[in-house]
Amino acid sequence: MNRREIKITAKEAAKQAGKAAKLVTLVFLLIQLGLNGLQLLTNFLTSRTSGGGSISDALAADTRNKAIVYIIMVIVGIVGVLLNIGYTRIALQVHRREPVPMESLLEGFQIPGRAIGLRLLRALLMLMWTYAILIPAIILLSIPITPLDRMTESDTWFVIYLVVLLIVAVAVSTAVSYRYWGATFILLDHPDYTVRECIRAATEMTRGHRMELFLLDLSLLPWNLLCILTAGILYIWKMPYIAAVYAGAYEELDRQYQQKKERARELRQQFPTRQYPPEQM
């Protein structure tokens, strides 16, 4: 994956998209800001609400307030997921030099079941992988550690082992996050795919390219930091470019993945009795 070429293409595509992409980005950011503000306002108002004089009334009011907060959080989360699906469509349109209509932001609301299902399944899988690594580290952390002035050689090796295990846990968690990279793009490009098929395709597509995706994120980190320093205002101009970079990376990985599948089909036709593994979906 040629990061430099992908970025050059994304820069040209974002420039061609022009004001339309910036306007859609502005609306997207304002809606996200409004959703976050709604959640903060709800937390503030419910925290100031008194349940009355008695303890039972206070407990009832506290329970009611927590329920309201949780409901608002769920609604905000769902709307945020669906809007992100819509902006992913915008990213593909910018990269492909297609028109960028405002209606594309609402595309997630046309497939709410698949969009939310994909987010939940991906979160569940990442959580399972993370806990599989973190649980041994948590167990080891619960073991009392001897003070430094009384440490034996075995205690020192135990601490070193613990630090290494924690580093490995962080590394594995990061790698797992790239395992399902691109699943949202696949969801939009393949409306006939189920949520599980999108996850499987993303896993196969990113195999052998996860370090490249990590380096791509690192290369875009300066732009993200600069946008944050401007209170997010710079995102209006740079978010279409950043999104187009990711869309370009997806299309490059997808192209290589489709070529791999095609080669596997050809080999199966030539050697029908031979077991050939590349297409594992």
Regions found by a protein language model. Give the residues of each.
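Hydrophobic alpha-helical membrane segments
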Residues: 1-281
